[in-house]
UniProtKB/Swiss-Prot annotation:
PANTHER family: MALONIC SEMIALDEHYDE REDUCTASE RUTE-RELATED (PTHR43543:SF1). Keywords: Flavoprotein, FMN, NAD, NADP, Oxidoreductase. InterPro entries: Nitroreductase, Nitroreductase-like, Nitroreductase_HadB/RutE, RutE-like. GO terms for molecular function: oxidoreductase activity. It comes from the Bacteria. Belongs to the nitroreductase family. HadB/RutE subfamily. This is Putative NADH dehydrogenase/NAD(P)H nitroreductase XCC3605. Its cofactor is FMN. It is an enzyme of class 1 (oxidoreductase). Its EC number is 1.-.-.-. CDD domains: RutE-like.
């Protein structure tokens, strides 16, 4: 049994964490991004498939490649963020299953048309993207996840000639409280859950 996290840790991860729309002009080091990934990789995925592929866009050149794919409402904040993580998924993730899941022939479960693997790759990369948000918060970073972009343009700019497709984007850095909207409500347990 794991130890219970204290209230301050739960606040940092969930209760007081906010989706950031503006970031301070403070760089995020490559070492910190590597530390971030080294936490994310331990999150569970089906058959340990780990289909997510991450591109951490930090340079002016990278942001210029990303800019044409961004929706109008997301462009300014994304270009200003120190890091934009592209959460992608590898439709040929099963090729690594002999290494990642050696105690069964898991690769054979996903052999066949690539489209048959897309659902699992998308679902599990979404999990891994959520782990990235929580890991970022645990490391003192703030996150701003987004879906407002043109997937085909991102794929052409960053994943051309590969079996990788984009899922969603997450801006990362140190949030500027001035850019926050008022805290929005959440559904109560009785509105969103039930016990069967």
């Amino acid at each position: 049994m794991s130890d219970l996290l204290n209230a301050a840790a739960l606040d940092q991860l969930f209760r007081t964490a906010r989706t950031q729309n503006a970031f301070l002009d403070t760089p995020v080091s490559e070492d910190l991004l590597r530390e971030l990934y080294d936490l994310v990789k331990w999150g569970p995925t089906a058959a340990n498939g780990s289909p997510a592929r991450f591109v951490f866009v930090t340079t002016a050149e990278g942001k210029e490649k990303l800019k044409p794919a961004l929706s109008e409402g997301n462009a300014a904040k994304t270009l200003a963020a120190p890091v934009t993580a592209i959460i992608g998924f590898d439709e040929d993730f099963h090729e690594k299953l002999p290494y990642l899941f050696p105690h069964a022939d898991a690769k054979s479960w996903f052999d066949g048309p690539r489209t048959a693997r897309t659902e699992s790759a998308f679902r599990n990369s979404s999990l891994q993207g959520a782990y990235l948000i929580l890991a970022a918060r645990a490391l003192g970073l703030d996150a701003g996840p987004m879906s407002g972009f043109d997937n085909a343009k991102v794929d052409a700019a960053f994943f051309a000639g590969t079996p990788i497709k984009s899922n969603f984007l997450v801006n990362l850095g140190y949030g500027d409280p001035a850019g926050l909207f008022p805290r929005l409500p959440r559904l109560s347990f009785d509105e969103a859950a039930r016990i069967a």
